[in-house]
Design a protein with these regions (language model features):
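Membrane-interfacial amphipathic helices and adjacent loop/beta segments
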Residues: 1-30
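A cross-family acyltransferase "interaction/gating" segment
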Residues: 2-3, 17, 36, 50-128, ...
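Conserved beta-strand segments that form the floor/walls of ligand-binding pockets within enzyme
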Residues: 11-12, 39, 114
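Short low-complexity stretches enriched in small and charged residues
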Residues: 26-30, 43, 67-75
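Generic beta-sheet signal
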Residues: 36-42
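Short active-site segment of divalent metal-dependent hydrolases/proteases
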Residues: 46-47
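Cytosolic-facing loops and C-terminal tails of multi-pass membrane proteins
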Residues: 127, 131-148
């Protein structure tokens, strides 16, 4: 999967390194200042998709510094019966291969992409924007918030 990510201009973050996060923020700011877009996954981890983990606010800072909006987008997966699908889960001991096999082994999984209003244009700080984005995504995807 790494080669695919590299081909699509992915900016890789070394987890747990504040110094590296600062470097990444500089790179994100450069991309944003060129008028391009950057997608970040502020949970910083994977889950089974049944709840929303805490958001890390650091990677939101470049958008605020560049005067660019933060556009929260929720992605959820559903069974044709209307129940939430766990087939795309990629957490715990599940390998990427197992995750992919679970997805392609399904006859049908419905993916829902929910957009929410732009944030960060009214002087909020990154933590306020992260909290508002988390709440918007949880509401849009119908997910409970977790504190872990």
């Amino acid at each position: 999967i790494g080669w695919l990510a590299k081909k699509n201009d992915t900016i890789f973050l070394r987890r747990g390194s504040r110094g590296h996060a600062r470097l990444i923020n500089e790179e994100i700011a450069k991309v944003l200042s060129e008028g391009k877009y950057v997608a970040v996954f502020p949970e910083g981890s994977t889950s089974d998709g049944t709840c929303l983990l805490n958001f890390h606010a650091a990677l939101i800072q470049p958008a605020l510094a560049c005067g660019r909006p933060v556009l929260p987008i929720a992605l959820s997966y559903w069974e044709p019966s209307g129940e939430r699908s766990l087939a795309p889960r990629y957490d715990g001991d599940i390998s990427l291969g197992e995750c992919i096999r679970a997805i392609i082994g399904r006859k049908r999984t419905i993916a829902r992409l929910i957009t929410t209003p732009a944030l960060g244009l009214n002087g909020e700080d990154r933590r306020q924007v992260a909290a508002a984005a988390r709440e918007a995504i949880a509401a849009g995807a119908g997910l409970p918030l977790t504190s872990s």
